[in-house]
Amino acid sequence: MSNCFILLAAGKGKRFKSKTLKQFINYKNKPLFMHSIDKALKSNLFNEIVLVTNSKIKLKNKKIKIIKGGKERYQSSLKALNFIKNKKFKNVFIHDAARPNFSINLLKKLSKHLNKNNAVVPFININSSAKYFYKNKIINLNREKIFL
């Protein structure tokens, strides 16, 4: 196992309109970002977890490294990748701290698929109708070819 989990938690959540940053909102008695960290730790898939944030956070787990993020998401991702580039991880998972509703099983499936592929992206099929508005016409889209 040579995996790294990068958790992006430096965002401002401009659309969220709260004094508290979304990733730090308390949910089930802990900050939202901690749900993702806990799942990454419980999965036993990762040698290291990199928390990218612009807030002052201290965590005691030695697997977790905390680094300063950038102004934009891509800058935070790049800072994290530069931070780990000499560590020779086989796989790197990058996730958004404000979206903790993934399962440990999903992490394990992604890891398994990385044994056969260079990159993987999780998705779900849609069940609802999907429409496309183009040149004053509403066009029905084939749900079997649309994923979230």
Summary of predicted features, one role per range:
Residues 102-148:
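Conserved core of the sugar-phosphate nucleotidyltransferase
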Residues 92:
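Short aromatic/hydrophobic "clamp" motif used to bind/position activated sugar donors
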Residues 7, 33, 80, 95-96:
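Residue-level signal for inorganic ion chemistry
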Residues 2-53:
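N-terminal glycine-rich phosphate-binding loop and ensuing alpha1 helix
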Residues 11, 96, 125:
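Active-site glycine-centered loops adjacent to acidic/histidine catalytic or metal-binding residues
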Residues 24, 66, 119-121:
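Conserved beta-strand scaffold positions in the cores of enzyme catalytic domains, especially
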Residues 14, 97-101:
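Acidic metal-phosphate-binding loop of nucleotide-sugar-dependent transferases
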Residues 32-89:
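Conserved N-terminal catalytic core of the sugar/cofactor nucleotidyltransferase
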